[in-house]
UniProtKB/Swiss-Prot annotation:
The lineage of its organism: Bacteria, Pseudomonadati, Thermodesulfobacteriota, Desulfuromonadia, Geobacterales. It comes from Geobacter metallireducens (strain ATCC 53774 / DSM 7210 / GS-15). It is a multi-pass membrane protein. Residues 38-49, 103-145, 191-193, 255-279, 334-343 are periplasmic. This is Probable peptidoglycan glycosyltransferase FtsW. GO terms for cellular component: cell division site; plasma membrane.
């Protein structure tokens, strides 16, 4: 794999600067909001109000470095590494279950423990799946329209990945990867009746997955009527609503939120947008949503104008992943969707998510340098 890190102003202009600006701005904003949302809790738990800020700052620097590396690698080179990368990620997903290697938290086994850092392989697996599908869809071309060659093999792969993720109690990542895969197949020309049939067949299984597992069933019931159990299953979403209500139109002011003071669970991770809503108001939330929308729209433009099918599928998969995660997170914190445990890209606290997200943006930026009409 050829790497070239020499950058000049003329070369930078070849990248989609809107995508680059949105990614960097959201990341910087995320570092600020992680500190605001976590400082009180960090002071009590670690006797250091800057604990999460320092870690998120390091993750942001590493993520930006990963993005720069990905920007400088010709995206077409990922084609030959797609299969080994996917196999490597499958191995990492399985290592999570080995005692002494894997780590668990709140009943979920999703991490591989390293000194000072926990790696979440599911974040890597999302990009690995996109790379592999882009490579495979490019290779199959018209064969993707047939069930035996263009649909069934991907469903087998998806079933294996989702089974591992469900064993890790990571339904959010499983649904996200499933959604990305289905949309990539649809964009590639898979017959809609195959997709519709698969969705219909999956619904009973999904119902069983949710209603047969106590904590998932309670989440659905809390989603339908959080006030029925406001001190337990409905507590988190009610506190989130209170945060948005306190913020109003213009917010209480940066750092002035009250719900993060041990009222709102996961204030610096999954529910960080609630803190944004309380401190920066509806205006702040709209600005964040608009930035995500702009990033997604520019990403779709890159996909549509890519010079080759591999670049088109790769860009489409990445922008779909970012869009789904942002939409689901916003839906959860506002009560439009049941609680899923998905981070808000760029903004929520978390090393694996931030670094992998910025790396994916770097790939997208490289595709943007080789669109139709560019040399």
């Amino acid at each position: 794999m050829n790497l070239n890190f020499k950058l000049n102003l003329k070369e930078i202009e070849r990248y989609d600067l809107v995508i680059l600006l949105m990614a960097v701005a959201l990341t910087c904003f995320g570092v600020v909001m992680v500190y605001s949302a976590s400082s009180v809790m960090a002071t009590k738990k670690f006797h250091d109000g800057f604990y999460f800020l320092k870690r998120q700052g390091i993750y942001a620097i590493l993520g930006c470095a990963a993005m720069i590396v990905a920007m400088r690698i010709d995206y077409r080179q990922w084609r030959e590494y797609a299969v080994p990368i996917l196999l490597g990620c499958l191995l990492l997903l399985l290592l999570v279950f080995i005692p002494g290697i894997g780590g668990a938290a709140k009943g979920a086994s999703r991490w591989i423990r390293f000194p000072g850092f926990n790696l979440q392989p599911s974040e890597l697996a999302k990009i690995a799946l996109i790379m592999y599908m882009a490579y495979s869809l490019d290779k199959k071309q018209e064969k993707v329209k047939f069930f035996s060659t263009g649909f069934a093999p991907y469903m087998v792969l998806l079933a294996i990945l989702l089974a591992i993720l469900l064993k890790q109690h990571d339904l959010g990542s499983a649904l996200t990867m499933g959604g990305v895969a289905i949309l990539m197949l649809f964009a590639a020309g898979t017959r809609p009746r195959y997709i519709l049939g698969m969705v219909v067949l999956t619904l009973p299984f999904l119902y069983f997955l949710v209603m047969n597992v106590d904590y998932r069933r309670r989440r659905i019931l809390a989603y339908l009527n959080p006030w029925e159990d406001p001190t337990n299953t409905g507590f988190q979403i009610i506190q989130s609503w209170l945060a948005f209500g306190n913020g109003g139109i213009i917010g209480q002011g940066l750092g002035e939120g009250k719900q993060k003071m041990f009222f709102l669970p996961e204030a610096h991770t999954d529910f960080i947008l609630s803190v944004v809503g309380e401190e920066l108001g509806l205006i702040g939330v709209i600005v964040i949503a608009a930035m995500f929308l702009m990033l997604v729209l520019r990403g779709v433009r890159v996909a549509l104008m890519a010079q080759d099918p591999f670049g088109r599928f790769l860009a489409f998969g990445i922008v779909t992943l970012l869009g789904i995660q942002a939409f689901v997170n916003m839906g959860v914190v506002t009560g439009l969707l049941p609680t899923k445990g998905l981070a808000l890209p760029f903004i929520s606290y978390g090393g694996s998510s931030l670094i992998v997200t910025l790396f994916a943006v770097g790939i997208l930026l490289n595709v943007s340098t080789r669109m139709k009409g560019t040399p």
